[in-house]
């Protein structure tokens, strides 16, 4: 089952319709985290690097075999984490391009009803960025200035959470 990025996030961001379970590596998440997501990687950075090298040299089948071998010792703990994250509220699995890692996490978590995102993180990012420009164009910038101690920070704290911000 697949979910479109625009069905997960409203234009220009906001609370996702489902809780994203981000199975990208920690390094990938560090370069761009998803709003409201819980990061539970299927591969750590070293494992991802090893799989990527094999993929480039030997192809997908060999890379999948390496991925299975390097993740086997951690699989039980990762499965339990994905299951716990998918319990209690509607969730969706997300990887880089919406392919093998999110499909594998869904299968291994024994949650076939939990969708994955079409196009993964890349498609979500594109969707959010496309919605950002029109959203910003509809707003009037407001600049807060003043000398030190004039209450600028207090004002910002009082306005925190205001729908216009």
Show the residue positions of the predicted features.
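Hydrophobic, well-ordered beta-alpha structural blocks that scaffold small-molecule cofactor pockets
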Residues: 123, 127-128
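Cytosolic catalytic domains that perform sulfur/thiol-centered chemistry
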Residues: 1-115, 131-138, 142-154, 160-165
């Amino acid at each position: 089952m697949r979910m479109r990025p625009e069905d997960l996030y409203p234009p220009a961001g906001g609370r996702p319709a489902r809780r994203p379970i981000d199975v990208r590596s920690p390094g990938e998440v560090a370069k761009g985290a998803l709003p409201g997501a819980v990061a539970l990687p299927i591969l750590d950075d070293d494992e991802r690097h090893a799989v990527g090298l094999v993929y480039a040299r030997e192809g997908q089948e060999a890379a999948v075999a390496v991925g299975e071998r390097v993740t086997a010792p951690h699989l039980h703990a990762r499965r339990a984490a994905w299951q716990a994250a998918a319990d209690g509220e509607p969730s969706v699995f997300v990887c880089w391009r919406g392919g093998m890692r999110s499909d594998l996490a869904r299968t291994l978590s024994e949650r076939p009803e939990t969708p994955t995102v079409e196009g993964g993180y890349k498609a979500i990012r594109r969707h959010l960025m496309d919605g950002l420009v029109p959203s910003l164009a509809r707003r009037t910038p407001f600049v807060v200035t003043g000398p030190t101690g004039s209450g600028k920070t207090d004002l910002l704290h009082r306005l925190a959470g205001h729908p216009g911000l």
